[in-house]
Regions:
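Acidic, Ser/Thr-rich, low-complexity intrinsically disordered regions in fungal proteins
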Residues: 1-69, 82-105, 115-145, 165-184, ...
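Eukaryotic multi-pass alpha-helical transmembrane domains
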Residues: 82, 224-227
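Residue at a conserved register position within TPR or TPR-like alpha-solenoid repeats
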Residues: 163-165, 230
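C-terminal substrate/ligand-recognition segments
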Residues: 153-163
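TPR repeat positional signature
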Residues: 19, 74, 156-158, 223, ...
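All-alpha amphipathic helical-bundle segments outside canonical DNA-binding/catalytic cores
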Residues: 211-221
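Residues that mark the junctions of alpha-helical repeat units in TPR/alpha-solenoid scaffolds
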Residues: 15, 75, 152-154, 193, ...
Length: 282
């Protein structure tokens, strides 16, 4: 029988909530698995984009209009890549016959999907056009229905790249190719980590400046992953670099501590220094 619009939307939200939860836990889809995207229900309705403060940033007319994907759809699509990356990371100890720089490798396939997702993101949801930093604290809290998913999408996008290129996980993957690793590949992964890890600390700084309280524990999980990168990078002889990396680590750790009411995060930060848990986090 035909469902009324309210019931149909509730069922969509229920389905995608369960699927999103399983993806974020890195779990196999199981009973929720379906064959092909055509069999999936349409994405749930997203909140309208907040009023823009000014017109410094031009949004192209060809950005989708009424058919533009909402912020919830963007977040859900990025969660699919997160699932693939976490499963890839869990197989870090298993040797592969293909090096990650091979176009046919799992690494290259996931990286291509991540880049493809960026081409589908409407410009209005991207960092600069969204104008988060220009919104008042009151407006940010009033429009959490939009900014919550937007922040989630920002965090998972950058953390996807950080986890895929994590220096510790990558070193385990490269053990079988020590004599033939292209220098350009190592430089590329280093640049990606540097850029996208800094975006996480930049976002954390924005929350602090706007006094915007975030409550999603997944964001703490993302910050913890980035913290492990900064911690590993701090073990250098150069004092200036060491202090910079430890400062970034401390910023991530402070953010993670804002989620201690969640047991798994509480255990993570229970050590006064935090270093031991973070070094074992992955």
């Amino acid at each position: 029988h035909t469902l009324d619009p309210v019931t149909r939307e509730e069922r969509r939200r229920c389905f995608w909530s369960l699927l999103l939860l399983k993806r974020l836990h890195g779990a196999e889809i199981g009973i929720l698995d379906v064959t092909g995207e055509d069999n999936l229900p349409w994405y749930p309705k997203s909140a309208e984009t907040p009023t823009r403060i000014d017109d410094d940033v031009t949004i192209e007319l060809g950005d989708g209009g009424k058919n533009r994907q909402g912020i919830l759809a963007i977040a859900i699509q990025l969660s699919e890549i997160w699932l693939k990356i976490t499963q890839y990371a869990r197989r870090r100890g298993k040797p592969s016959s293909l090096p990650p720089w091979s176009p046919q490798s799992e690494y290259a396939t996931i990286m291509a999907q991540q880049m493809e997702s960026e081409t589908r993101m409407p410009k209005i949801h991207r960092f600069k056009p969204a104008q988060f930093s220009k919104q008042s604290t009151k407006d940010l809290h009033t429009r959490r229905d939009y900014w919550g998913p937007w922040i989630f999408a920002q965090f998972i996008y950058h953390t996807n790249i950080c986890l895929l290129n994590h220096p510790l996980l990558l070193s385990l993957r490269l053990r079988n190719f020590q004599s033939q690793i292209p220098e350009i590949f190592l430089q590329s992964t280093s640049d990606l980590i540097s850029s996208h890890a800094s975006w996480i600390t930049h976002l954390i700084g924005m929350f602090e400046a706007k006094m915007y309280k975030v409550t999603d524990p997944f964001l703490g999980h993302c910050a913890a992953i980035v913290a492990t990168i900064y911690l590993q990078e701090s073990f250098v002889d150069d004092l200036a670099i060491r202090e910079e990396k430890m400062g970034n680590f401390a910023q991530c750790l402070g953010f993670v501590r804002g989620f201690v009411e969640w047991p798994h995060i509480g255990r993570l930060v229970s050590d006064p220094g935090g270093e031991r848990q973070y070094s074992d986090y992955l």
